[in-house]
């Protein structure tokens, strides 16, 4: 005001000396005020602390830029921010046998950016493979076509197998309780345990309870009975369900007529002979009710015969096996597929086998018995495990707190897209803290005071993990003695060549028809064939029960079992 708007002083009706003096005074005072204001403004502008409101510079760090490739590695190209510019880098999973977890909310890009690359690169490097495909046939189509296009990584070309309950035409048949792969009754118990806990996931938290163990033991006894009866001719999962659904007055005499099962079933026999009919009915119902949900002609078709074995990493007969679930029927199909999981884990986790990969998409939709043990021991047997799910709370809910913690704490490689809440906090703690610079400015009329200090703070805070955009991932990898990775932690965008992926997908072939149900006249007989198989199994079990009861009745040492009814 004094400097720019004092022209009106010249128009005052005062002596010229007074006007001149007043004008000079206001111009001088205005000039001094202008200088002081400019000085104060320069202090504020010079020390603008709001340029980096999200602390991006402090929380950016140098990441791995080398490509470290080996016969086992999975390598993902990346872009990361550091020192005010974007840099190219690599995520090198040089030891996939220490297991990998891929986390992220729906749409974060975990399958597109990570899981798909694991499948493709491991097929190129000659891995046998087991893929649990929750949204069939997304991952299965990738595995099938990549095997067609890249068979050169294998000494013996693997065969491709698929389990698909929705469409028997495009499914192989496999009996998960094949008698040749059960050595003693503990194998039968593990199969019964797996199927029951998949059908009743709340039982995971109640293991050891009376009404949890009773149905498991009963169903295990039935499986083992079918294994020893006529050398396992009828030892299939559908036959076991049908046998369970016969009258208990017929079941118990038959089972207890075998010395191997007599002690196993003694609690049930005590309840029967002691007149505790209600208790016995409750125990049997605990097994019958959940298993009855699995009575399906299509499921019976797939699980009642074996076109291949589950030793997928057999060096002489390597396999790539994809099993497909359906989100609309995940509870039923997941229980059956859990049985394949448990058998495969036991068969592949052995010395002297081919390197193999187990890829599980949406892990919480299936109960994977022995998962913690597989992660802990598979490294020495060249089994690479890759688990995809949304966050740790799902794992705690479906696997229990103890097993979930073991899985979370023993995995060597972790990828995480956007996650929130406790999962984000857990990951932030895992990535640790780093020394960060802090600057504070104090401005007053006389002086400017600047304070600079350092303190340890989260390298990747939970808020950053909660706000990751699609395709951005944080995580860490493990290394080897001869393949050292100094900077194991990453916070980057995983680069995917979208155009290349589109071209590949456009050229993909559908999984072919495996079983042709067309008759000589060109009519589709799938429904009739599947139904005939369903009726055959029911009739075979009915015949087994009838023959066994006649055997017991004609045996002087056993006929007392029938008289107890």
Cite the ranges covered by each PLM segment:
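Low-complexity, polar-biased intrinsically disordered regions enriched in Pro/Ser/Thr/Gly
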Residues: 80-87, 200-210, 438-455
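Conserved ATP-driven motor cores of ASCE-family P-loop NTPases powering translocation/secretion/packaging/pilus
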Residues: 375-377, 381-384, 388-478
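N-terminal short leaders/motifs
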Residues: 66-86, 265-278, 413, 419-420
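P-loop NTPase motor domains
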Residues: 46-54, 91-384, 399, 465-484, ...
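Ordered hydrophobic segments in well-structured contexts
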Residues: 60, 73-75, 322, 472-476, ...
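A short glycine-/small-residue-rich loop at the edge of a beta-strand within enzyme catalytic domains
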Residues: 61-69, 335, 362-365, 418
């Amino acid at each position: 005001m004094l400097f720019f708007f004092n022209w009106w002083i010249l128009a005052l009706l005062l002596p010229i000396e007074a006007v001149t003096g007043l004008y000079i005074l206001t111009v001088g005072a205005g000039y001094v005020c202008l200088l002081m204001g400019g000085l104060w403004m320069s202090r504020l502008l010079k020390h603008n602390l709001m340029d980096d409101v999200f602390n991006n510079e402090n929380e950016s760090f140098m990441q791995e830029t080398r490509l470290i490739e080996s016969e086992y590695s999975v390598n993902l190209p990346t872009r990361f921010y550091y020192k005010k510019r974007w840099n190219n880098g690599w995520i090198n999973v040089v030891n996939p046998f220490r297991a990998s977890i891929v986390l992220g909310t729906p749409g974060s890009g975990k399958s597109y950016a990570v899981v798909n690359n694991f499948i493709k690169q491991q097929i190129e490097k000659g891995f046998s493979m087991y893929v649990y495909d929750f949204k069939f046939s997304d991952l299965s189509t990738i595995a099938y076509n990549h095997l067609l296009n890249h068979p050169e990584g294998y000494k013996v070309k693997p065969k491709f197998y698929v389990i698909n309950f929705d469409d028997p035409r495009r499914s192989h048949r496999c009996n998960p309780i094949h008698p040749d792969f059960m050595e003693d009754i503990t194998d039968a118990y593990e199969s019964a345990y797996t199927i029951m806990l998949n059908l009743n996931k709340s039982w995971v938290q109640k293991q050891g309870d009376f009404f949890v163990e009773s149905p498991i033991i009963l169903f295990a006894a039935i499986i083992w009975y079918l294994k020893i009866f006529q050398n396992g001719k009828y030892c299939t999962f559908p036959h076991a369900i049908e046998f369970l659904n016969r009258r208990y007055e017929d079941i118990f005499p038959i089972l207890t007529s075998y010395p191997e099962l007599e002690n196993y079933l003694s609690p049930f026999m005590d309840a029967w002979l002691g007149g505790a009919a209600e208790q016995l009915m409750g125990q049997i119902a605990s097994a019958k009710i959940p298993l009855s949900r699995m009575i399906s002609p299509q499921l019976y078709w797939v699980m009642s015969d074996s076109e291949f074995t589950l030793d997928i990493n057999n060096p002489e007969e390597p396999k790539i096996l994809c099993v497909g679930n359906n989100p609309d029927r995940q509870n039923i199909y997941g229980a059956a597929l859990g049985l394949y999981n448990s058998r495969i884990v036991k068969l592949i986790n052995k010395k002297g086998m081919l390197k193999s990969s187990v890829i599980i998409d949406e892990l919480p939709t299936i109960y994977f018995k022995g998962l913690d043990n597989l992660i802990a021991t598979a490294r020495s047997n060249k089994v690479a495990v890759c688990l995809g799910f949304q966050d740790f709370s799902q794992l705690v809910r479906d696997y229990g707190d103890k097993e979930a913690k073991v899985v979370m704490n023993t995995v060597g490689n972790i990828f995480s897209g956007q996650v929130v809440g406790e999962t984000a906090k857990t990951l932030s703690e895992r990535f640790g803290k780093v020394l960060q610079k802090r600057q504070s400015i104090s401005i007053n009329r006389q002086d400017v005071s600047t304070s600079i200090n350092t303190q340890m703070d989260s390298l990747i805070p939970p808020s950053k993990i909660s706000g990751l955009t699609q395709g951005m991932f944080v995580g860490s990898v493990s290394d080897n003695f001869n393949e050292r990775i100094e900077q194991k932690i990453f916070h980057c965008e995983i680069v995917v060549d979208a155009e290349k992926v589109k071209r590949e997908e456009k050229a993909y072939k559908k999984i072919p028809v495996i079983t042709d149900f067309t008759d000589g006249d060109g009519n589709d007989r799938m429904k009739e064939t599947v139904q005939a198989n369903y009726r055959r199994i029911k009739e075979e079990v009915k015949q087994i029960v009838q023959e066994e009861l006649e055997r017991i009745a004609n045996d002087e040492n056993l006929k007392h079992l029938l008289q107890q009814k």
